[in-house]
Amino acid sequence: MNRSVHPMKVIYPGTFDPVTNGHLNLIERTHEMFDEVVIGVAASPSKNTMFTLEERVALMEEVVAHLPGVTVKGFSGLLVDFARQEQAKVLIRGLRTTVDFEYEFGLTNMYRKLLPGIESVFLTPEEEFAFLSSTIVREVAIHGGSIEQFVPAAVANAIEKKVNERQ
């Protein structure tokens, strides 16, 4: 954990459907920089998710259990409202490509309009995770491919179970 002069709570938001090793890498790196990390698992009702919000929260809790100072909370509605509720002034966002940057840049400006003083910190993935996304993992799993190298073991097991239920 960070030993900064001022304690700081940050939020790393996402749908995490499913959480990948890339997400976990960003969480671990964020954990090294900030005192308190809240993983905000978004309900995302407009997305056709593989896992329910409750399942995604439970999987994330299992995956980050080894990290003191990291908590997991589900939320619905606007991210800025969740940040306000959590009294967090910093959002952590992962950037894989310039397309991600353009999208996140637009969101950041909107966040600042809705919650003045909110800041976004952008982290790029380590090279081995640069291509990785939840969408890719779901597609590989649905088509019978091996996902063990892309997600934590508990997540791979949960995905396998979910895919088998749908068949």
From Swiss-Prot:
Principal location listed in the UniProt entry: cytoplasm
GO molecular function, one term: pantetheine-phosphate adenylyltransferase activity
Taxonomy, superkingdom: Bacteria
Localization per Swiss-Prot or TrEMBL: Cytoplasm
Entry binding sites for substrate: T15, K47, L79, R93
Listed EC numbers: 2.7.7.3
Name of protein: Phosphopantetheine adenylyltransferase
Record Pfam families: CTP_transf_like
Site feature location: Transition state stabilizer: H23
Catalysed transformations (reactions): (R)-4'-phosphopantetheine + ATP + H(+) = 3'-dephospho-CoA + diphosphate
Organism: Vibrio parahaemolyticus serotype O3:K6 (strain RIMD 2210633)
Oligomeric and partner information: Homohexamer.
SUPFAM superfamilies associated with the record: Nucleotidylyl transferase (SSF52374)
Keywords of the record: ATP-binding, Coenzyme A biosynthesis, Cytoplasm, Magnesium, Nucleotide-binding, Nucleotidyltransferase, Transferase
Described function: Reversibly transfers an adenylyl group from ATP to 4'-phosphopantetheine, yielding dephospho-CoA (dPCoA) and pyrophosphate.
Catalytic class of the enzyme: transferase
Pathway: Cofactor biosynthesis; coenzyme A biosynthesis; CoA from (R)-pantothenate: step 4/5
Example GO biological process: coenzyme A biosynthetic process
InterPro entries referenced in this protein's UniProt entry, alphabetically: Cyt_trans-like (IPR004821), PPAT (IPR001980), Rossmann-like_a/b/a_fold (IPR014729)
HAMAP family: PPAT_bact
